[in-house]
Amino acid sequence: MMHTGKVWVGGRRVLLVCPFVSGFVRLTAIAAAIFLALLPQVLSAQAQGFTIEQALGYPYPYGLTTAAHAARIAWVFNSRGSRNVWVADGPGFTGRQVTHYTGDDGMPIASLELTPNGSTVVYARGSETNAQGEVADPTSDVHQPEQQVWAADVSGGEPRLLGTMNCGFEGCEDIQISPDGRYALWSARHALWLAPITGAEPARQLAYIRGDNVQPQWSPDGKSIAFTSDRGAYSLIGIYRFDSRTLQYVDPSVFRDMLPHWSPDGSKLAFIRLTGGEGGFFSGRLQPWTIWVWDAASGTASQIWASTADANGSYPGDEWEGDAFQFAAGNRIVFASQADGWVHLYSIAAAGGAPMLLTPGAFSFQGGVTLTPDGKALLYASNQNDTDRRHIWRVDVDHPGPVALTHGESIEWTPVTAGTAVVCLGSTATTPALPYRVTPQGREPIAASAMPNDYPSAQLVTPQQVVFKSPDGLEIHGQLFVPRSHAQRSPALVFMHGGPPRQMMLGFHPMDAYNFMYAANEYLASRGFVVLSVNYRLSIMYGREFREPAQGGPRGASEYQDIVAAAKYLQALPYVDPQKIGLWGGSYGGYLTALGLARNSDIFKAGVDYAGVHDWSAFFGGGEAAAASDRAKIAYQSSPVASIDKWTSPVLLLQADDDRNVPFSQTVNLVPLLRAHHVPYELTVFPDEVHDSLLWRTWVRVFGATADFFERTLVKGEAIHTVPPEN
């Protein structure tokens, strides 16, 4: 008799066939069959070394902040989807958990603040809303979630609800604590909201004010609020006074005023004025800008500085950090500019005069910028002397000459001061990020015990910095992940980041999505893939001309030649099989993945496209007017759909249907084209998820599916089923 049975082996159900009769012989045969079925996966596991769950199993820290009058820091740990607030006190900085949310619930924490004395943390919990006014619900909970503002005492006790936020765009969370620590102020639903931190009273709307009112700033004496009132084509700087309950606008104009900041004594208010129309690289329009200072005594405002009207003079919005623009000691104003082709820090006297370049050189600053407590110096992160990493630097606000506080084969970002100490977030190539105390000897980890004991740091590889040339001679930087043990001819992958104003580095990344994608590339290397992560033109940290190519993106896709050059670099490596090259990426990286498959299926044999753009012309409004537009025509030719006739390689499409960055319609409209052209594809949709996944388990699925797809297509040579066109 033929005996059959099914058992679960390595997550798959395996059919066992045993041509024996009965008894001990049959049991022995079944045991042998199980062993034989398990053997390939045991060997694979030994070679693989760790799972995708382990690779992503670290706590990711973000939101590092400090108390104004206490040596206390606070941050958020996202541990397998559970986000919680932690604090540590100087000088020892022993980390301890303040909140105790559990489960992979898809509820982000943002805009974490400490009261000035450090006794209470205040934060927003829940996502921003989409165009329909809906907070993200990635767990598909039948109870509609809200984004709310909470406070929790560091000494213990349950968090208390201060009010509803539900702000309407990515990164909109902006909680400001009053100088006396009694009130929290935030912007949401076009208004400014105020609540006592005790939670004794519900949040109330500060005042009726037309427009979309954002960027609130307390005056140093706590008696006034400055803010930006967005009125559509223009915006105003407003000041609300508590004592008189009156509203004043500062030098109203037809331009876009933004980012108000008080002087330390409250006698002046600085702000930025954008004098061009709607700018940005993809618009092709320049964005000149000016700095203005309003004097409280006279009630008048004057322009103290103006950018040039060329490309270098345009407002550096892609890399702007709001805290780079601020009032420092000595009546000086700090700001960022790319006047010399690099995004640098400058300072200028509040009375005007020549600006002072504080950070000269062929590098850029990026990340949080903070003033020292005395207001006389800046702490910031830059890639000075280490192009593909970032370190912490200090510079006086009135004298050029940056001093490195960290260096070496590590990466640091988000510096803050806590008492006399400098604290930052940091990582290495094989160690995920943690908070660190900066010391003269280097850096000391904070809350290192939060790292799982089984985290496979020892099994990760250190990527190699590589530089290769594109066909037009431009130098392109990348990070090459080479498996610890690999076949004589291994399959290889090109990885492209999103953004596109981003930079992948030689270690775990500061941003959450790219932090996880770095871990995914480590995981792919552990599975035997050689991975080349490419900082194609449009990436930051290599100068404005590199970041803003004339024919980039929908204006010609000139960056695509960098992706082909990366593939050819891989094909020339002696340990890479030149016929087994794939590519993958998310968002803009998904666009480049689809473009590679559509234009060069002869080079790229498989791809994973996570939330990519497939038709740039859709952003020009569609219809006859868009079709007749030269810009729309170029945008279409720069799109994957323009080369659909040449697309033959299999693709895995992944996207969330509550994507607030790339319209889900980009995937909806691509699939029928793939079907009509018999392009082999697989599709996974994540209902109610967003662009940068809120659920940890979604990232696990995305990266697990990515590795599985490439193993089936590039390693095993399995054919992906081609879906015939619908009748």
Regions found by a protein language model. Name each.
Residues D89-F93, D153-G157, P196-A200, R241-R245, ...:
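Short loop/turn segments that connect beta-strands within beta-propeller blades
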Residues A68-H69, P116-N117, P179-D180, P220-D221, ...:
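Residue-level detector of Asp-centered blade-edge/turn motifs that repeat once per structural unit
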Residues I73, V121, G181-A184, I225, ...:
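Hydrophobic beta-strand positions that form the internal "hydrophobic ladder"
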Residues P19-S22, R26-V42:
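Bacterial N-terminal signal peptides
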Residues G322, A336, A404, I411-N727:
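Serine-hydrolase catalytic core recognition
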Residues V76-W86, Y101-P108, Y123-W150, P159-C172, ...:
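A flexible loop/linker signature enriched in serine peptidases of the S9 family
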Residues T51-N84:
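Beta-strand-rich domains and repeat architectures in extracellular enzymes and scaffolds
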